[in-house]
């Protein structure tokens, strides 16, 4: 069994370089919610150093609130903003001798695209226009995955080690009870359940089906590095290989 481990980088966390030695894919902030040209370049260099797949992490234009503000923008505006961000990272990666291989939206752009078909289509069209070989990462079973498939893109269905799930398979919104899993033991159990058995226990106590092709590890968590190491060790015991596939 093979699974991808991804982490969001270039967002001002001190753990980036250490975390890159434990994951297989990096989602690099492209300046709209965090990061700038220098952090993008450094993140790309580290990813190349450790053999980690380079991906863009585009966002709504919302640096003040770290890309977590709900926005209702015209589809063509989102399309242009995503193309702009992907183009920037693709150019930096190419200049450093690498190549961008995937795209994972950030924050509220990601969450809204999971349930809003028009927004999801705008993102998928932008990805295809920049490079139709790019992989599109989205919440497992979401509208973004469907949009990517409709556009003929390779998709990667994502699950979260440290987030609570609602009965419909979407994430519990940040700020609500149960949104974040702070226990490493519970996060590990949830991750293994999703990877092994393709299901997750929701806050209501029911099971929701999920396809775990890539697992997100948040680098800004209280015990992010410790958990990442523990997860890699447990995967090895379980015979689960980590690769960007």
UniProtKB/Swiss-Prot annotation:
UniProt keyword terms in alphabetical order: ATP-binding, Hydrolase, Nucleotide-binding
InterPro entries: Glyco_hydro/deAcase_b/a-brl, LamB/YcsF/PxpA-like
Catalytic reaction equation(s): 5-oxo-L-proline + ATP + 2 H2O = L-glutamate + ADP + phosphate + H(+)
GO molecular function: 5-oxoprolinase (ATP-hydrolyzing) activity; ATP binding
Enzyme class of the recorded protein, top EC level: hydrolase
Enzyme nomenclature, EC number: 3.5.2.9
Domain of life: Bacteria
A GO BP annotation: carbohydrate metabolic process
CDD domains associated with the record: LamB_YcsF_YbgL_like (cd10800)
Pfam families the record matches: LamB_YcsF
NCBIfam families: PRK05406.1-1, PRK05406.1-3, PRK05406.1-4, PRK05406.1-5
Assigned protein family: Belongs to the LamB/PxpA family.
Quaternary state and interactors: Forms a complex composed of PxpA, PxpB and PxpC.
Role summary: Catalyzes the cleavage of 5-oxoproline to form L-glutamate coupled to the hydrolysis of ATP to ADP and inorganic phosphate.
UniProt-recorded name of the protein: 5-oxoprolinase subunit A
Species for this entry: Serratia proteamaculans (strain 568)
């Amino acid at each position: 069994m093979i699974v991808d481990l991804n982490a969001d980088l270039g967002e001002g966390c001190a753990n980036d370089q250490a975390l890159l030695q434990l994951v297989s894919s990096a989602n690099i902030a492209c300046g709209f919610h965090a990061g700038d040209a220098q952090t993008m370049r450094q993140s790309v260099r580290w990813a190349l150093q450790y053999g980690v797949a380079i991906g863009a992490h585009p966002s709504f234009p919302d640096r003040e609130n770290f890309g977590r503000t709900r926005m209702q923008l015209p589809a063509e505006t989102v399309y242009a903003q995503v193309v702009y961000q992907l183009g920037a990272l693709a150019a930096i990666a190419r200049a450093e001798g690498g190549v961008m291989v995937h795209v994972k939206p950030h924050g509220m752009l990601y969450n809204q695209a999971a349930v809003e078909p028009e927004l999801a289509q705008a993102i998928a069209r932008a990805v295809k226009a920049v490079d139709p070989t790019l992989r599109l990462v989205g919440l497992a079973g979401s509208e973004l995955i469907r949009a990517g498939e409709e556009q003929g893109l390779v998709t990667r269905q994502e699950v979260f080690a440290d987030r609570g799930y609602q009965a419909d398979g979407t994430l519990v919104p940040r700020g609500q009870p149960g949104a974040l899993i702070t226990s490493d033991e519970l996060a590990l159990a949830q991750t293994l359940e999703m990877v092994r058995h393709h299901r997750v226990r929701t806050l209501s106590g029911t099971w929701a089906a999920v396809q775990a092709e890539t697992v997100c590890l948040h680098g800004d968590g209280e015990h992010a590095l410790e958990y990442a190491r523990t997860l890699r060790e447990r995967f090895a015991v379980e015979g689960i290989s980590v690769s960007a596939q």
